[in-house]
């Protein structure tokens, strides 16, 4: 931790959960009342950290504890550090794992050759910003074809509990960190400790940890720590962008937990809640975080963020406010997850501002539009099929249904990060192979193939082998069935 120089000493006068009131009696021209966002230290060995949130009068401040307040009592002395919360930056932080205070949590010695910087920075001014129109390939078919990501943009993975947000984010890390030439930063906000440990182990085994930094503010930590960990990770990202002129891939899991932590802090501080109990300042707090994720002439920060959607309600204020900051929105569907169509991305609800002919090219754009049109027609026909059956459809509509069902299955993909659970080896598919497969399905080349031949494959040519194998296995299965029947007789 950076050394503290201030000798402004106060006294704890009130403790209510994570909210602590402190009085400073020796206020003078030399010792001023601690400004907003100043870090205070108290407790045994100064182990309890408090951030000033408001000044109540000319002698009292109110702060939120960033650490548990067990053992804190009225009358204890509080030291004003004279500095805001700071985090380490520098080449020494690569391959390491940190908490919100910049302490290492990977059981290794503290990094050397680092500089400490405030986690509270302003977004770059408009004059320094730059825009890019370059596509960032993920190796995941459905994303690259229908909702391409922007290099230097912000993409959100929206979904309720258990539809695969973290799995999809982990797969993106696996596919993109290896081919990403810059630095990758993973920021865990209010998520499970187990997931952080698993990710660290996987990245170490994959050999990509040397160009990666991890920062965690886990579920069990006080709301103040979860509220600031995103800002700390962004300070690290800004260092690599501005000082080392490198591109940064910033992965955040989960933005909803950041908003939730802000809601807890707001409630503790006694602010009047807005709709559904959210804090009245949610839009401002989210903008202060999101607007720092920006591109400048010296480098770009590409951000992928998981966003939990409470009760699958996409009109929830947390989801609505987050949508407005993103260049690509990837919506995960519980219905598709229940049908086993993984990744469970809803292609009709998901969108990307990159999906225009001038950026991705006319062929890609036309194919994406045709795929969406086919899937939308199938969605409309589902009610008729449920009531009257396929027989009542016109021949043309039956062809549309067949194409849509084959497209749905082709856009599934086995993941590297789930190999141990599914028993299927992961596939990384190039954009050209994905577009080629979709085009051939739309041209009815695979009309006579079983739908299962297109399910959980990589490139489209794998369907030939899968169909051939299924045809060989079928007579064998029938022979086994006949032998069993004969034995029973």
Curated annotation (Swiss-Prot):
InterPro entries named in the record: AAA+_ATPase, Alt_ATPase_F1_bsu, ATP-synt_VA_C, ATP_synth_F1_bsu, ATPase_a/bsu_AS, ATPase_alpha/beta_chains, ATPase_F1/V1/A1_a/bsu_N, ATPase_F1/V1/A1_a/bsu_N_sf
GO cellular component terms given for this protein: plasma membrane; proton-transporting ATP synthase complex
Region entry Disordered, spans: 465-489
Main location: membrane
Enzyme class of the recorded protein, top EC level: translocase
MF terms in GO: ATP binding; ATP hydrolysis activity; proton-transporting ATP synthase activity, rotational mechanism; proton-transporting ATPase activity, rotational mechanism
Reaction equation(s) it catalyzes: ATP + H2O + 4 H(+)(in) = ADP + phosphate + 5 H(+)(out)
Record keywords, A-Z: ATP synthesis, ATP-binding, Cell inner membrane, Cell membrane, CF(1), Hydrogen ion transport, Ion transport, Membrane, Nucleotide-binding, Translocase, Transport
Domain of life of the native organism: Bacteria
Enzyme Commission code(s) on record: 7.1.2.2
Biased composition (Basic and acidic residues): 465-477
Membrane association type: Peripheral membrane protein
Quaternary structure annotation from Swiss-Prot or TrEMBL: F-type ATPases have 2 components, CF(1) - the catalytic core - and CF(0) - the membrane proton channel. CF(1) has five subunits: alpha(3), beta(3), gamma(1), delta(1), epsilon(1). CF(0) has three main subunits: a(1), b(2) and c(9-12). The alpha and beta chains form an alternating ring which encloses part of the gamma chain. CF(1) is attached to CF(0) by a central stalk formed by the gamma and epsilon chains, while a peripheral stalk is formed by the delta and b chains.
Similarity field: Belongs to the ATPase alpha/beta chains family.
Role description: Produces ATP from ADP in the presence of a proton gradient across the membrane. The catalytic sites are hosted primarily by the beta subunits.
Protein name, UniProt field: ATP synthase subunit beta 1
Origin species: Marinomonas sp. (strain MWYL1)
Gene: atpD1
